[in-house]
């Protein structure tokens, strides 16, 4: 069977950026990596209801700058900034360096692969039919402006005895085109029948010369007049 490379990993340095940016060597590298993993796990657990898509970690000169990309910034910030200040104190203690937290709002959650996967998984946990959940998410993404989207669910769908995989796609999802801006992410739905995996690919357009290039249909070539 053909295997697929991770769509984000293959595009790093081309159209995608790393989510952890720092330099270290030897034992320091392992320590930084472990703390990054622990920080992400802590934040994802703490901010479950805040629709967090991505957490970027930068470490400039004995400090840490954490950027939280969320569709619901009000939940992260809290009343008068109390929640985000408590988060900052906890992370400073956990990471052992002064931490600065930035919050970036996601304006179009329908075009974010992680948030779409979370939404489909939550619907599956509420016993919504998987085909309906997939179709609704695909239609919303295409309406907002996606060039293409594919959603795949795997597991005991509808409580079936035998696990299977189903998928739904609209538009183009060119996995081999390295300049294609493809947002990919996964999430798990924990149902009474077991775990159902959700994968989402969203094609937003091609990045040419460092900017987003809108894909427009090519005009048909003019017809040649027949010689008399």
Swiss-Prot record:
Briefly state the protein's biological role: Binds the lower part of the 30S subunit head. Binds mRNA in the 70S ribosome, positioning it for translation.
GO terms for MF: mRNA binding; rRNA binding; structural constituent of ribosome
Q: What is this protein called?
A: Small ribosomal subunit protein uS3
Q: Name one GO cellular component term.
A: cytosolic small ribosomal subunit
**Species per Swiss-Prot/TrEMBL record:** Pseudomonas entomophila (strain L48)
Q: Which PROSITE patterns match?
A: KH_TYPE_2, RIBOSOMAL_S3
List the SMART domains.
Answer: KH
**NCBIfam families noted in UniProt:** rpsC_bact
Alphabetical list of PANTHER family matching this protein: 30S/40S RIBOSOMAL PROTEIN S3 (PTHR11760), SMALL RIBOSOMAL SUBUNIT PROTEIN US3C (PTHR11760:SF19)
Say which domain of life the source belongs to: Bacteria
Q: Where is the KH type-2 domain?
A: 39-107
Q: Which residues form a coiled coil?
A: none
Give the keywords, sorted.
Answer: Ribonucleoprotein, Ribosomal protein, RNA-binding, rRNA-binding
- Matching InterPro entries: KH_dom, KH_dom-like_a/b, KH_dom_type_2, KH_sf_prok-type, Ribosomal_S3_C_sf, Ribosomal_uS3_bac-typ, Ribosomal_uS3_C, Ribosomal_uS3_CS
Family in the record: Belongs to the universal ribosomal protein uS3 family.
Annotated SUPFAM superfamilies = Prokaryotic type KH domain (KH-domain type II), Ribosomal protein S3 C-terminal domain
How is this protein organized at the quaternary level? Part of the 30S ribosomal subunit. Forms a tight complex with proteins S10 and S14.
Q: What Gene Ontology terms for biological process does this UniProt record contain?
A: translation
